[in-house]
Each structure stands twice: as structure tokens, then as C-alpha cells.
């Protein structure tokens, strides 16, 4: 990893040994702010708290999980008691590295703290212990993750761009500014191909940094363009992991019969660009997968 970049990963092979084992790991218990990865926990909590799902809520779950919709996440977060949902999920699933946002930031679901180890544990819970309707609903949506988020940001980085199908993914990003340098188009993403050329766009989820963006540099072609959320710049020392640094995460399942469970979490230098961060995490994910084969 380049200087100033922090990475953590866990890869669990469900076919290794008798009942599966971790086959690649680094900084497994290091805490990161979750960004949109926390939406999986929101979905688990919601589905396990009721036996029927009204059509309107089914639409919220679909758009939140497939297209990382922030308004849907905020609706479910508020209904579930904000940080209380994280406390419930951490206890129920045995997530020792997971904690809700600070009490001073109750609405910021993206400021939840979690680790690569705990993310893998959540996926294993869905695969092995969750009720079939919970498992099938959540993983069904993650298998159908859209190239573009509802806000126009490209979410095909890491696993979708580095690994062949089949896969199921939930991505997370925060601290890169609010306006994408290039608006995502459904036909522009190339799943299964590592790309280090022109960059897809990136975003700050509304739940993790709702304030305006601070940009440096110019928007001219070929010029260096960097942006970081104003909230992140002001919030150093707040107790939220890596505030002041952009984070980019790729998590999910890969391979036939969901053989591999992966979580790759990264924090990048303050002011770092989306394109450079995407190249780093996608290259890292491709290298991890190559070493498994």
C-alpha cells in the first residue's frame, strides 16, 4: 500500500478444511468507519424484527441494498432507533469490533465503526444462520447490485471490477466529496475487469457526511482534482475512525456456491482522489483473489 493508505482485509474460504477457515488476513480487527456497508445491518435488523414486509418497505430495502440509496437507509435508521440498531446487531451477531456512531452524531449511520473481521462475520451469519427469508432477501439484492448508485455514483470498484461473476456485493465510500466528477451510466461499468484507466465516480453517503464538499485543484481535463467532505475536515479527534481521511470498502461473496467471503476496507490520504483510491482497492482485491487460485 502507498504511504498514507491503510488497508485491512479478511478472506474466508467456506470450502477450506472441515467447516471453512480464514485464508488471507491483515489488520482484521482494525476499526474503520462503515460508510454504506452498515446498510447490511440495517436490513438484517429490519427483517428479523417482523414477519411481513409492506410493499413500501420492500422498495426501501431493494433500493438501499442494490443501489446504496442513502434516503432509504436514513428512513430505516431513524425508525430503528438510530444507534440502537448497531448495539442490537453487535450483540445478536457477536460483533466485537462494531460500535454505533458517537452520541454526539446520532443521525450519522455512516459513522458506525466496524472491522473486516466483523463484516465477514455478518456475511457468514447470513449464509449459515439467518432465516431463509432474511438470507434470500438480502443476498438476492446484493447479487443484483447496480453499477450506479441512485445519486449517480459508480459503485463497481473492488470486487465487481476485479472478480468474475458470480458475486454479491455491498460497497462503502465516504470523504470524497458530494458531486461525482463523472456521472455514472449503467453501461459504463465493466464488472470482472481490473481497470486502472479513467476513473468512475465517487460519493459521500448522505448518512456519513451530509455537509458540503471542499474541493481543491481544477476540473480541467488532466488536472489533479481532489475533494474531501467539510464535515470530515472539521471532525478530527471526534472518536470516529479515520475522520479527515476518505474511506473506500468492497465487501461480499464470490465464487461458485459463495465459496469466498471477502471484506477489504481502506482509508486513504486526506485529500486523496477517488480515481487513485479506486485503483488501489481494485488492484488489491484482484491480487487477493489471484493468490487464492
Write out the residue ranges for each language-model feature.
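A mature extracytoplasmic/lumenal domain signature
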Residues: 13-15, 36-38, 48, 68, ...
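Penicillin-recognizing serine hydrolase domain
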Residues: 1-8, 14, 21, 78-293
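Short alpha-helical patches at coil-to-helix transitions and adjacent helical residues
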Residues: 37-40, 66, 70, 112-120
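Acidic helix-start/capping segments at beta-turn-to-alpha-helix junctions
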Residues: 12-15, 57-72, 78-82
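Active-site SXXK
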Residues: 31-53, 64, 262
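Amphipathic coiled-coil signal-relay and dimerization helices
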Residues: 19-27
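A short glycine/serine-rich beta->alpha loop
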Residues: 26-32, 105-109
Amino acid at each position: 500500500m502507498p504511504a498514507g493508505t491503510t488497508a485491512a482485509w479478511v478472506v474466508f474460504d467456506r470450502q477450506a478444511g472441515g467447516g471453512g477457515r480464514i485464508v488471507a488476513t491483515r489488520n482484521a480487527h482494525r476499526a474503520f468507519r462503515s460508510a454504506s456497508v452498515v446498510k447490511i445491518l440495517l436490513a438484517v435488523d429490519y427483517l428479523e424484527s417482523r414477519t411481513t414486509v409492506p410493499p413500501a418497505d420492500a422498495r426501501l430495502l431493494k433500493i438501499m441494498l442494490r443501489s446504496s440509496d442513502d434516503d432509504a437507509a436514513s428512513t430505516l435508521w431513524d425508525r430503528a432507533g438510530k444507534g440502537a440498531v448497531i448495539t442490537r446487531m453487535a450483540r445478536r451477531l457477536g460483533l466485537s469490533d462494531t460500535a454505533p456512531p458517537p452520541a454526539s452524531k446520532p443521525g450519522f449511520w455512516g459513522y458506525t465503526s466496524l472491522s473486516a473481521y466483523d463484516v465477514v462475520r455478518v456475511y457468514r451469519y447470513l449464509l449459515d444462520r439467518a432465516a431463509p427469508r432474511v438470507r434470500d432477501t438480502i443476498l438476492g439484492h446484493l447479487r443484483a447490485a447496480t453499477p450506479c448508485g441512485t445519486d449517480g455514483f459508480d459503485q463497481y470498484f473492488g470486487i465487481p471490477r476485479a472478480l468474475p461473476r458470480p458475486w454479491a456485493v455491498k460497497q462503502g465510500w465516504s470523504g470524497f466529496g458530494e458531486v461525482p466528477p463523472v456521472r455514472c451510466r449503467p453501461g459504463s461499468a465493466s464488472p470482472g475487469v481490473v481497470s486502472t484507466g479513467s476513473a468512475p465516480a465517487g460519493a459521500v453517503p448522505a448518512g456519513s457526511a451530509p455537509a458540503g464538499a471542499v474541493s481543491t485543484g481544477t476540473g480541467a481535463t488532466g488536472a489533479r482534482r481532489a475533494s474531501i467532505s467539510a464535515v470530515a475536515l472539521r471532525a478530527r479527534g471526534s472518536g470516529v475512525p479515520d475522520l479527515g481521511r476518505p474511506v473506500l470498502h468492497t465487501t461480499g461473496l464470490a465464487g461458485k456456491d459463495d465459496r469466498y467471503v471477502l471484506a477489504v476496507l481502506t482509508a486513504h490520504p486526506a485529500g486523496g482522489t477517488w480515481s487513485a483510491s479506486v485503483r488501489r482497492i481494485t488492484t488489491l482485491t484482484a491480487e487477493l483473489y489471484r493468490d487464492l487460485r
